[in-house]
A protein has these predicted regions:
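Carrier-protein-dependent adenylate-forming modules in NRPS/ANL systems
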Residues: 1-126
Length: 126
């Protein structure tokens, strides 16, 4: 069984139980599944039709970082995780090397490290 199917099954069986608990927040199995599926839909709507280009997910140890990575997988995209503790120059180099269609900011503080030329949005959707 793959991880995406297991998350769906856990959402059905344990919907209100915590899937992720961290000092930066928590999310239930249902929240993890539904949130990552909604974000996957947004990714597919923002990317070129049929695109499977890699994406960058920028954040730090939050449930939304994991949700963003799962969303990339649900949308059929590879992803490159980037931690906000990295120097801004290194983050820029990674983004240049990956050339993603979208950079997902898994938390607001990640926006400070990202280029200001568009193509990214804050997770969770507000």
């Amino acid at each position: 069984m793959d991880i995406l199917n297991q998350i769906r099954e856990n959402a059905d069986a344990f919907s209100d139980r915590p899937a992720i608990i961290s000092e930066n927040g928590s999310v239930t199995w249902r929240g993890l599944y539904d949130g990552s599926r909604r974000l996957a839909e947004r990714i597919n709507n923002m990317c070129a039709p049929g695109s499977r280009a890699p994406l960058v997910v920028c954040g730090h140890k939050s449930p939304y970082m994991i949700m963003s990575m799962l969303a990339c997988a649900y949308a059929g995209h590879a992803y490159c995780p980037v931690d906000i503790s990295m120097p801004a120059e290194r983050v820029a180099d990674i983004i240049d090397a990956v050339s993603p269609e979208i950079v997902l900011a898994a938390e607001e503080s990640a926006l400070d490290l990202l280029p200001q030329d568009g193509g990214f949005f804050l997770m969770p959707p507000r």
